[in-house]
């Protein structure tokens, strides 16, 4: 699945995926056990793990809320200097807590759908693409590693901000619970991220096989092309799997995007208040741009993974057009290629959330621009206090 174990990137990706799996089991956000009795390993939904995950994560959230109210008496100097910053920080905190409550409820409510998706991925991996697992997909490994690094970077950035902010008297339990909640939410998003990347990897493998088939037909027109029917069937299943994945995670991903973009606003506003209003010049200010860059990197990885899958589907249509340039074409080959091309033109890999917007690079860029426009509006609104 990950290529040669001697290569560092496939090895790192494999270890990071294992860590994600064990961490998800530990926090109860992947409530499935492995049923190894069947020829192809399948996942079985565990009621105990489902209940354990719901109770554990809700307990952590409500404990975090209680501790936050207990230790809210001490106010940061930045909040005294700028009440708008305090208001924004409270609103972002409420958004994050509500997002956590909804995400964990959706994880519980939609666990059956997620189980079906995972079992379909296992069938594709160990049955349909079994002979192609030796082919290394560089983008898959790269994106998995980067996503895990951003999760680690966010946790380190959160710790840095809590230690670096002047006048902040933090409670270690509050910080640890906040990190645990953030880690749990990131693992939920990681499941979607890996699902998208696996679909991309399978489309990429189909494209590579189609390219090989084109090369063989150019050299030998009598080459067996019956595999096109198999690729067409797999492509249909991947399109359906993509649709199910988007439906299962559309609310979680929408909340994730809202939380990420709104978090970027408050980080920049903190930097403006400390740097311009309070004229506090110290090394700790580096923590704010560092946190901002990690958040944008994490946000863009999710956008780029979806965009990569869309482009892989578009590339399939381009490869199929090459078949029309072949000489000595067979009628059956032409019929198979036309059917495949029709499917590619009428059904595409799209990641539209809640029917509102698509996740691709163009829309991701618009979201980032919109975030900074909101920031400009806040600066204009609160200009006299800055």
Curated annotation (Swiss-Prot):
**Pfam families linked to this entry:** 7tm_7
Write out the tissue specificity statement of the associated record: Expressed in taste bristles in the foreleg and labial palps. In larvae, is expressed in neurons of the dorsal and posterior pharyngeal sense organs. Expressed in taste neurons that mediate sensitivity to bitter compounds.
UniProt key word Membrane: yes
- What InterPro entries is this protein classified in? 7TM_chemorcpt
GO biological process assignments: detection of chemical stimulus involved in sensory perception of taste; monoatomic ion transmembrane transport; signal transduction
Which key words tag this protein in UniProt? Cell membrane, Membrane, Receptor, Transducer, Transmembrane, Transmembrane helix
Where, in residue ranges, is this chain on the Extracellular side?
70-89, 177-178, 276-282, 385-386
Cellular component (GO) terms are: axon; dendrite; membrane; neuronal cell body; plasma membrane
Drop me one GO molecular function for this one. taste receptor activity
How the protein sits in the membrane? Answer: Multi-pass membrane protein
Q: Which domain of life is it from?
A: Eukaryota
Q: Where are the transmembrane segments?
A: 49-69, 90-110, 156-176, 179-199, 255-275, 283-303, 364-384
Subcellular localization is given as: Cell membrane
Q: Which residues lie on this side of the membrane: Cytoplasmic?
A: 1-48, 111-155, 200-254, 304-363
- What is this protein's function? Probable gustatory receptor which mediates acceptance or avoidance behavior, depending on its substrates. Seems to be involved in the sensing of bitter taste since it is expressed in neurons that mediate sensitivity to bitter compounds.
* Similarity comment: Belongs to the insect chemoreceptor superfamily. Gustatory receptor (GR) family. Gr22e subfamily.
Protein name per the record: Putative gustatory receptor 22b
Record the organism.
Drosophila melanogaster
